[in-house]
A protein has these predicted regions:
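Juxtamembrane intracellular "pre-TM" segments in multi-pass secondary transporters
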Residues: 1, 183-216, 237
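Structural signature of the two symmetry-related core transmembrane helices
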Residues: 70-84, 277-292
Length: 402
């Protein structure tokens, strides 16, 4: 297989794992296991928390000691076994601690898969979006596979579907671990000035422009959790009224839009308008989506607005990883990717998980959620982020690819 095909399969499996459980875990925990809002918030905060801690270890190892593809293989194989076991767990305490361990295994692979792709692509600005889109396809495939399984097992609806979402994620993870041994050999870079690559990555924040980028990325990432954490309960609420069987498939509308935006629009917009303007457009798509959620009707418009996630995610987060790759010195690119992962999927999502939960509780009276109030909050904050980008962020020239 060609390098691009192998990288595409890598992205497909990487995000099929996450896409199997992330969109619908909240509904499973609340409706079937009886977890309360705080407990669900804690479970959702674990991957961001792990992303604060573990990517720098993974990035350091891949930058200085072991080949990236072998690191990913080991982490995914062990992680898959954990997921299969977690799918059978029903009590909160056991699930929480096992999820802590699993998330510590999965989190480093988010940055490492990006790094492998960037290093093995000749023109990352042009080709990365086409490779990364296979991750979105994997996320969609996982959602439809889960919906298909649940439709075929419709007779079990009364007693719930159990941990099927976590079991499916475990199967994808084991397959990813096996496949990772076939990835392009990506050894550590030789000759780095410092043996501590992650320290050098942190020093990039001495650049005021990069510091602005990191801070705003963090704030935007906090608002991402309003989508990940609250969309499935919102769609299953009386206000929208979708069934648990249909929600996984309906939510893939967002990823279908991602495919179009990532594969077709992102390379064109970067070339024509530059990364800075693409990032601003990405932030501006967020308040539009959230204001539609806040209005909450008609139902078809709320469902259609899921497609805006394609612009929200690709034009900001995917473009952000490309930006970091263009400015990071070659010998610390793994750790630089870990730094943006830390700021967004890590501390940003971690704070966002609790913030979204707190906002939901604030706007809940006698068990009834005021969804309008909930979604106005991220709408306002993302408008502020877009204005800050326009005022304070300037695009820089890239480093030499190597």
């Amino acid at each position: 297989m060609s390098v691009k095909v192998r990288l595409g399969i890598m992205m497909f499996l990487q995000y099929a794992i996450w896409g199997s459980w992330a969109p619908v875990l909240a509904a499973y925990l609340q409706n079937e296991l009886g977890f309360n809002g705080v407990q669900v918030g804690v479970i959702y905060s674990l991957l961001p928390l792990a992303t604060i801690i573990s990517p720098f270890v993974g990035g350091q190892i891949a930058d200085r000691y072991f080949s990236s593809e072998k690191v990913i293989a080991v982490l995914q194989l062990i992680g898959g076994v954990f997921l299969l076991f977690i799918s059978q767990v029903t009590d909160y305490s056991t699930m929480m601690w096992l999820m802590v361990l699993y998330c510590l295994l999965y989190a480093p692979t988010l940055a490492l898969t990006n790094s492998i792709a960037f290093i093995n692509l000749k023109d990352s600005e042009k080709d990365f979006g086409v490779i990364r889109v296979w991750g979105t396809i994997g996320w969609i495939a996982a959602g439809w596979a889960l919906t298909g399984w649940r439709v075929l097992n419709v007779s079990d609806t009364a007693k719930g579907f159990g941990g099927d979402l976590l079991f499916l994620a475990g199967l994808f993870s084991i397959l990813m671990g096996i496949m990772s041994f076939t990835l392009p050999h990506t050894p550590p870079k030789k000759g780095g000035a410092s043996p501590w690559a992650f320290v050098e990555a942190f020093k990039m924040m001495k650049n005021k422009n990069f510091l602005v980028f990191i801070i705003i990325s963090f704030v935007v990432a906090t608002e991402l959790m309003f989508y990940y954490q609250l969309t499935s309960p919102f769609l299953e609420s009386e206000r929208i009224g979708l069934s648990p069987q249909s929600v996984p498939a309906v939510m893939t509308i967002a990823q279908i839009a991602e495919i179009f935006v990532m594969a077709l629009l992102l390379p064109i917009f970067i070339k024509k308008y530059g990364l800075r303007n693409v990032l601003v457009l990405g932030v501006l798509a967020w308040p539009l989506r959230y204001i539609i959620f806040a209005i909450g009707e008609p139902g078809w418009l709320v469902i259609a607005s899921l497609a805006l996630h394609g612009f929200c995610f690709v034009f900001f987060f995917t473009a952000a990883f490309i930006y970091v790759d263009t400015i990071a010195p070659p010998d610390i690119r793994h750790s630089a990717q870990s730094l943006i992962t830390f700021a967004t999927y890590g501390i940003g999502n971690y704070v966002g998980a609790f913030f979204a939960g707190w906002v939901q509780d604030y706007f809940t009276v006698n068990g009834a959620v005021n969804w309008t109030g909930v979604f106005i909050v991220p709408c306002v904050l993302t408008i502020v982020c877009a204005l800050a980008f326009l005022l304070f962020f300037k695009e820089e020239k890239s480093t030499v690819k190597g």
